[in-house]
Amino acid sequence: MATLIHTLTDHSDDVNCCAFSSSCLATCSLDKTIRIYSLNDFTELPYSPLKGHTYAVHCCCFSPSGHTLASCSTDGATIIWDTSDGRMLAVLEQPTGSPVRVCRFSPESTYLVSGAADGSVVLWNVHSMKFYRSGNVKDGSLVACAFSPGGNFFVTGSSCGDLTVWDDKMRCLCNEKAHDLGVTCCDISSHPVSDGEHASGCFQMASCGQDNKIKVWFILFADFLGGELRYKCTLSGHSAPVLTCAFSYDGQMLVSGSVDKCVIIYETNTGNILHTLSQHTRYVTTCAFAPCSLFLATGSMDKTVHIWKLDNKQPCAGNTIENDSKIRTAENWSEDDVSAWLCAQGFAELVGLFKANNIDGKELVNLTRESLIHELKMSLWLRSKILQKIEELRMKMVSVPVAVPDEFLCPITRELMKDPVIAADGYSYEKEAMENWISNNRRSSPMTNLPLPSLVLTPNRTLKMAISRWLETQQK
C-alpha cells in the first residue's frame, strides 16, 4: 500500500527532479531554485532554497555520503553545494556552454558526470572539482545517465533513442537503439542478478522513453569485456510518454512517471504492477525512492512534490537482507547492503558516515566499541544501540538458513513450489498462483510481460520430483 503523507508546494514552476540522501530530499525546478527538506518532518532547511543558477534547473543529485549536492541548468553550469550549510563549493562550466540536462555522482564520489543538450558528456574529478575527460554521443541531446555500482562504467541516454555504455576513460563500449522516439531516463539497480549466463557482474537497468515504454535490460560490467546490454522485457503500463524511472534501493521495485499523469510501481522480478498513483494533475517528471525504500517522492509539472509512504509489507531493503530465501551472511554484505540494514534498524542518519568510511559487511560485524569511539566518533547512546544490533547480527550468522534453489521458487510468489506447472511462456509457476494470475484477466507472462499464446498449464512432474528430492536431503 502507498499512502500520500505530504505534498510540497514551494516551487513556483514545473518540478524537474527530486533526489534523496539518507536524511534529506532535494527538489529542483524551472523556477531556477533547488529546495532541501528534512526527512524527519519534510520541513524546508534554513538555508533553502539554493539560488545560483540563472535559468531552469533540470537535475539534482546527492553524493553517496550526502555531504554534497550537484545541480545542473540551462545556464550551462553544474553547481556543487555543501549540504550542511548550503554553500556553493564549485561551479563547473560545460566546456561547450550548452545547457546541462543531467548530472550524476559515481558510487564512490570519484567522478561527477554532466550531460548536455549538444550531446557532450563530461567527467569531472570530484576531489579536485576539475575537468577530467569528455566525449560526445553521435546524435541528439544527452538526457539520462546512470553509473554502474562499481563506478567504473556509466550509461547515457539520448534524445535520439540510444543507450551508450562508457568506461571511466570515456571510451564508448557499446551502443544500443533502445527507444524509437528518444530516451528520457535510465537507472541501474545496485543489486546483482543472474542473466542465466553470468554468475557475477550482471545488474538490471531500466530505461524509458517517448514511445510510452519502459525497457528492462541485463547489463554486464567486466573489465575484460567492457559493458554489454541485453534486453530482458518491456513494461507497457503507461498510455503516454514515460519521463522518469527509478529502482528502489534494494532493487525489488521500479517506479515510473508519465505524461499520462500517473505513477506506476512495479515489482522488478515479475513486472507486476503493485500500485498506480494518479494524484498529480499534470505530467509526472520525476520520481525517487528514499534509501530505505519507505518513502517515495514524485514531482510534476503541477509544481508539486508528493511524498508517499510505502507499506512495510512491500519489498524493503532491510527485510530483503534478512529474510530473502537467498540469504547471505552479514559479513558478505556490500556497502549498499549495510546502508539498507542501517535504514531498516532506524539508523538512517548513519548511512553517510558508514559510506564515507567504506564499511561493508565484513567491517560491520567486526566493529568494536573502540573503533566506534576513535574512528567513527560516535556518541555513547548511538554506540550502545549499534553494538546491540551488531551483536544480534553475529548471533544470526551462527545459523544461517539453507538457501532454496531459485528454480524451485515460484516467480510470482517467490515461495517454494508444491504443484509446479509450465505455462505457455515456457516458465514454471505454482499452479494456484498462475491460476489466480489468469483469473484476474491477466493475459501476459509474469516473467516477460509478453502476451501468453495460450492459457494451458501443464504439470511439471520433473520439477516436482526434483523439489521432493531436495526437501528429503534437507530433512536428513
Curated annotation (Swiss-Prot):
Residues 333-396 form the SAM domain. One of its GO terms (biological process) is protein ubiquitination. GO terms for molecular function: ubiquitin-protein transferase activity. Transmembrane segments: none annotated. WD repeats lie at residues 10-47, 52-91, 95-134, 137-176, 178-227, 237-276, 279-318. It comes from Gallus gallus (Chicken). The lineage of its organism: Eukaryota, Metazoa, Chordata, Craniata, Vertebrata. Keywords: Repeat, WD repeat. This is WD repeat, SAM and U-box domain-containing protein 1. InterPro entries: G-protein_beta_WD-40_rep, Quinoprotein_ADH-like_sf, SAM, SAM/pointed_sf, Ubox_domain, WD-SAM-U-box, WD40/YVTN_repeat-like_dom_sf, WD40_repeat_CS. Residues 403-476 form the U-box domain. Disulfide bonds: none annotated. The keyword Mitochondrion does not apply. Pfam families: SAM_2, U-box, WD40.
